[in-house]
Amino acid sequence: MLHMNSASSADSMEIMESHFDPTQQNDSTIIESRYSPEEYLEQSFEIQRIISGENSEPQTVASQEISDSQEEDTTLTSSQFEDCGTEYNEVVEDDEFRSEDEDDFMDEEEEYALYEAELSSSPSIHEEVIDCNFVHAIRGFEATVEGQVDATKGDMMILLDDSNSYWWLVKMCKNLAIGYLPAEYIETPSERLARLNKYKNSETSNSQQSVTLPPLDIVEKTLEAPSPNFRIKRVTFTCSSNSSDDEMDSENDYEAMVNRTVAENGLEIEFSDSSDSSLSAEYRSESEDHVTDSPAYVDLTELEGGFNQFNSTSFQSTSPLGLEIVETEINGSSTTADSKNSHSPYSKFSSAYPDAENSNISKINISIAGNKELYGNATQSDPSLYSTWIANKHKTASSATVDSPLRRSLSVDAMQSNASFSSYSSTSNTDKSLRPSSYSAVSESSNFTHDVSRDNKEISLNAPKSIIVSQSDSFDTSNVTQDAPNDVEKEPISGQMPNNLSVQSLKQLEVYPIRHSVSIEMPSEKLLSPRLYSSSTPSSPTKGFQKDDEEDSENRKQADKVELSPSSLLRQMSLPVDSSSQSDAQCTTSSVYITAERKAFSQSSIDLSTLSNHHVNNEINRRSFAGGFTSLADELSEMRELLHESPAPLECNEEMVIPTPELDASSAIPSSSISHDEDLLPRKNTEESTSSSSFSSLITSPASLQYDENPFKQSVVAELNNNSSSVPFVDSAHASDIHAYDNDHVSTKNKEFNRRLREFILDPDSLSGLYWSVKSAGVRASRRVSRNIEGESVSSDLDDIFANVLKGLSDEMASLLNTNR
């Protein structure tokens, strides 16, 4: 213990010596130490205690307690000193920071104010209106070179030129000096106006910030004001009817929903199910009237099933609109064919107009009900509509009238559907209207039995045993289908159909030939002209054309005595139809028409045996008359004049002879208009063949040609005498060419041309003729041999022959030209 005290005392002495060294002290200087003030105090107290302990080693308890208390006091004072120093330092630092920030802020404001003062011509603009004719200097400028002008801040100037972006030419208003100033030193009127608005806006914002707020007590009173109370009105519902529990539950839910939705509006809704209301009574009376007026409108469920064959008894009832409803008795239960009448478009209308049977509405609806297109699309969805359509067709057919024979022949009444044939009267009057006799809607034989399938639920009509078809140009039996008859007549058309034409079934139609008795007597001094007809104009198979009902009997007698021309004889001559042209579903037209080509007829050239033996394909070829002729008679009359009343009969040969064409030098076209096309060459079924390489047989010898005053006479007579068709004909273009030329048209130039052509044909080595022929007009060789014509190969054969002829001539010409060189 002593040793430790001595060591510590030695250390303390060293410390004291270092601190109290007189050499280290100076005048008016502060003692510097390596210890802090707190450490220095501690060291001083420690030194004092050591000194006191060395002097008096035995220490009393009181002295120890005093020393302990002193130590506590010293430690307390040191901690307090430390806390005070820290707080003081913080306060000093904060003050310094605040002062620095304030200084910086003040410096920025001053700088900004100075900057604005420098850029603006004046710190504030006093004038309220800016004059756009002047500019102002926003800072001062001193001229350094000649051409510049001095300006002070706020000077008013007139801008003379601002084309340069850096220097503007101005005129000073104070001394009228003219010079250049930097553009950035000049304030334009728009810039001055913007600065004025800036000052005004700042003043306005400052004034708005000074607006006084309302007193607090007023605000509290406004917030504490009570809101208005809304009165909710309760709505009750009463129901007087006795209903089941389920209905009551649903109604209660509905009432509760209505209560929630309409209570706010103060509405009152009553629910009443009483059956004695006027509305229900009116509705009940209307429904009773509907039932009494149309008892046949009932739901039919049996038709939705299936029944194939039954013996039915029927009766008819008429709806308010005149629609006949056919009711059938099936297995003792009476049902109605007009089932599910709710789908009918006339159900509501019939209930609204119960007395419309004798009105015009009933007549209109009868015609609508008779339309097949209206009911045809609805038969698959509702079979009762079709039965209603059938019933109305029976009624409308008895009262329908046809205006004219043309409409009669074009109407759908031409096709009759019946189970048995009725006898025909061939001598009936032609102007008799088509009025069928009485006919029951559904007969006992059950021709139109409704076969309703369970699976498909579609109505299909059983095909009748036979169908009687009237002969008409516009009627085509290919339109006959198994859907439904076009019309139901009570009896077939009298006088419109011969007895020997019938159709046995829909799948196998056979058209029998109709032979008419035609008088062979021909008029004496009159050429026969056929009737003009078209595809839309029907031709009746009876004598003549039927006249309208309004024409008198005299016109009808004249129509019966119309003279028949050869073309009309051919048209009315019926020929058997090949079985190969028939199919299962379609057949040819019931009236077979044969139309001959337009031929030249004379009084003595008609031979009935020739016409009857002439077999021509069953097709109609209509061509217009050439040369402006309105009829065949005018054309033939002109032809007879050109032929100088030639009485030579027309003979039918098996060979076809076409003379050599005569070329016209001026027009370089054949003088004969006979064409080598396929449609003008009759077809024959011979098996001869001619080689295309034999050119000598294809070129007509010029020795056989003889000249006459009319060069066409010989060629025309030769063709008419050697025509291969069994029916004589003259092409319409040929007739027009004959009419165009006359005897005076044959000139010496044409004869010279023909002579040179003949010389060239005889002597192909003639270079001049060959060159002239090929260069100017070309050569077309015509055939003078008999040849088989098979179908469509005629045109191709002729083209090949002509091409070979021209090719040979061209080769010869080229070889001759090469040799002459």
Swiss-Prot record:
UniProt keywords, alphabetically: Cytoplasm, Cytoskeleton, Phosphoprotein, SH3 domain
Chain segments carrying region Disordered: 1-36, 51-79, 267-292, 333-352, 473-500, 529-570, 664-697
Biased composition (Polar residues): 1-11, 21-31, 53-67, 333-350, 473-484
Residue ranges of the region described as Interaction with win1: 599-821
Function in brief: Cell polarity factor essential for the bipolar localization and function of structures containing the cell-end marker tea1 during the normal cell cycle. Regulates cell polarity in complex with tea1 and together with the stress signaling MAPK cascade, contributes to cell polarity maintenance under stress conditions. Required for the localization of for3 at the cell tip specifically during initiation of bipolar growth.
Assembly, per entry: An essential component of the tea1 cell-end complex. Interacts with win1, tea1 and for3. Interacts with tip1 in the presence of tea1.
Protein name in the entry: Tip elongation aberrant protein Tea4
